[in-house]
Structure formats: C-alpha cells, structure tokens
C-alpha cells in the first residue's frame, strides 16, 4: 500500500481540528494551522497593544533672556491702581518700606496679594507717582495738581529719608518766598544832556538798572550847536527796609536823586 502524505496546508479542512485519512482509514490529526508570517497588511487586523512605560521628568520651560525673567518685575496695587516696576528700582532705598516688602520680604511686613499677585498697599495712588519716579531717577517732580505736604506724608510713610529732606527743603523755600511778598521796585527819572548820558549809564551801580531813555529835544543852544536833552528812567528793587529800620541810600544813589531833581 502506498504511503499517503498529508499536506500541512490542507490540515484544518473539515471543521474544528481539521481531519484527514490515514493508513487504516482512521482520522489523522495534523498540526495546527500556522499563522501567516510577516506584517499585517494596512487596514486589516488590530495593532499590537503598547506596553506603558514610566515617564522620566523632562527639562522645564526655558528661562527668559536676561537671567531673572519675570522675577525682576514687581506689581503693586496701591489703592486700586496698579504700578509695575523692578526690584532694582525699589532696592535703591534699602531701609524703605517698599524695599523691605518686595526685595527683602521682611516677615514683619505681612502684606496680602490680590488675584493677580500684586502687593496690596492701602495708600493714595495719586501721590505714589512722585514716590516711584524719585526711586527711578532720583529727582523730585511735583505737578501743580499735587500738594507738597501730601508728597511729604507719603515719603514719610514709605520711609524714604532722602526724599523727606528734599520735600522739606522745598516747602521751606516756598514759605520764605511767600513771607517776603511780591518784589517792589523804585523808579527814578533823570534828566541829562547827550554828553553826560554815556558816563551816567556806565557808572550806574548799587542795584540800579537802566529801564528807558526818552529824548526831549534840545533846550540849550551854544552857538550853532544844539545840546540834546534826555530823560533816563532807572529802577531798583525795594528791599532796603528790614524790621522797620530804613537803610540810608549810598552816595551814588544820592547823586542819581540829585540829578533827577533838576526836572
């Protein structure tokens, strides 16, 4: 009897395990049908399940150029008005309230922050502008709408000693000018001839200033030549009285008065 060779590809025909015919006519079980080798064609079948691997921590976001990034900037909420400046500006007065609050983070100055992260300061924002500008460029700039006393009050609150001295000096100077009152002048009218005019103007001193020269024609006739006459108006500040004591005019002032009496 010839030996029957079973093709493995034919195994599995005829149902569940696949049966064939053996030497004695009994069923012969072949090996299970192998799966086709090679990658699964696109669009057919399911991809293999990926195995989850733990993620390693990666680098954080890059810092801003300049080294400090956003940490250099400070946001202040002064009486509902926002001001933005740098920690370097606030640190120019190390003993000030602002430096201790924002730069040194003094635990004794426990200040709340709003929803934007700005420091809450319950002061008048109108007078905070001159304070912040002084820390920026070191100059005191007060507009006409602001009172110097108000700036002084804020400078004392923020404990900026140099600004306190500067505002006090300005207030003192303004008080001195107000106490002196408006500047008054004394006027003199001198009559002179043309040949005397140059000498009189050149020798004028002691605070006297030339104001106006008026020609009044010729009053004298020497032969065929007319001598022109002029009125010379001079003035000086009236500041020769102190505490009721009248200071006598100098000799040159007396000469000017005598010449003026010729009119």
Curated annotation (Swiss-Prot):
The modification N-acetylalanine is found at residue 2. The keyword Membrane does not apply. Gene3D superfamilies: 3.30.70.2000, 6.10.140.750, Potassium Channel Kv1.1, Chain A (3.30.710.10). Keywords: Acetylation, Phosphoprotein. Residues 1-69 are annotated as: Disordered. Residues 1-11 have a biased composition (Low complexity). It comes from the Eukaryota. Residues 29-39 have a biased composition (Pro residues). The modification Phosphoserine is found at residue 33. InterPro entries: BTB/POZ_dom (IPR000210), SKP1/BTB/POZ_sf (IPR011333), T1-type_BTB (IPR003131). The keyword Hydrolase does not apply. GO terms for biological process: proteasome-mediated ubiquitin-dependent protein catabolic process; protein homooligomerization. Residues 72-172 form the BTB domain. GO terms for molecular function: cullin family protein binding; protein-containing complex binding. Residues 12-28 have a biased composition (Gly residues). One of its GO terms (cellular component) is cytoplasm. This is BTB/POZ domain-containing protein KCTD2. It comes from Homo sapiens (Human). The gene is KCTD2.
């Amino acid at each position: 009897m010839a030996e029957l060779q079973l093709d493995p590809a034919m195994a599995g025909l005829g149902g569940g395990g696949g049966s064939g015919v053996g030497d004695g006519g009994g069923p012969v079980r072949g090996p299970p049908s192998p799966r086709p080798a090679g990658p699964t064609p696109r669009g057919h079948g399911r991809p293999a399940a990926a195995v989850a691997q733990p993620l390693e921590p990666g680098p954080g976001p890059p810092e801003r150029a300049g080294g400090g990034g956003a940490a250099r900037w400070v946001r202040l909420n002064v009486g509902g008005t926002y001001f933005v400046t740098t920690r370097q500006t606030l640190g120019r007065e190390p003993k000030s309230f602002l430096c201790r609050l924002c730069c040194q983070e003094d635990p004794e100055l426990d200040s709340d922050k709003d929803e934007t992260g700005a420091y809450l300061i319950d002061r008048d924002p109108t007078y905070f502008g001159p304070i912040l500008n002084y820390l920026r460029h070191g100059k005191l700039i007060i507009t006409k709408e602001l009172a110097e006393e108000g700036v002084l009050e804020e400078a004392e609150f923020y404990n900026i000693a140099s600004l306190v001295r500067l505002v006090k000096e300005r207030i003192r100077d303004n008080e001195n000018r107000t106490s002196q009152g408006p500047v008054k002048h004394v006027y003199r009218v001198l009559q002179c001839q043309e040949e005397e005019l140059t000498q009189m103007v050149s020798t004028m001193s002691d605070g006297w200033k030339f104001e106006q020269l008026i020609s009044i024609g010729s009053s004298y006739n020497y032969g065929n030549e007319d001598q022109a006459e002029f009125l010379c108006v001079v003035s000086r500040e009236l500041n020769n009285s102190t505490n009721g004591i009248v200071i006598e005019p100098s000799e040159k002032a007396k000469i000017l008065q005598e010449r003026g009496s010729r009119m």
